[in-house]
From Swiss-Prot:
The keyword Secreted applies. Keywords: Behavior, Secreted, Signal. This is Accessory gland-specific peptide 57Da. Residues 1-19 form the signal peptide. It comes from Drosophila melanogaster.
Length: 75
């Protein structure tokens, strides 16, 4: 009976350890060298446009309905 209890306990411990290892996949990443504070990630650098952007168009005027929500209702 003691053997069965030890066997079940061992199985439970192994299952818990296995579950924890599968969740901690990013903790064993080795980083060599310090990260530079101004460095951009490679994906962001690749997605950046090669030419400077064109001048932005002027902002459109606000819609006339924008201020009507605060106006009191006329009856």
């Amino acid at each position: 009976m003691k053997f069965l209890a030890l066997f079940v306990t061992l199985l439970v411990v192994l299952a818990l350890v296995s579950a924890q290892k599968s969740q901690n996949t990013n903790h064993n990443v080795i980083v060599i060298g310090a990260k530079k504070p101004g460095a951009a990630p490679a994906a962001a650098a690749a997605a950046a446009p090669a030419a400077p952007p064109a001048a932005a168009p002027a902002a459109a005027p606000a819609a006339p309905e924008a201020g009507l929500a605060d106006a009191p209702a006329e009856s």
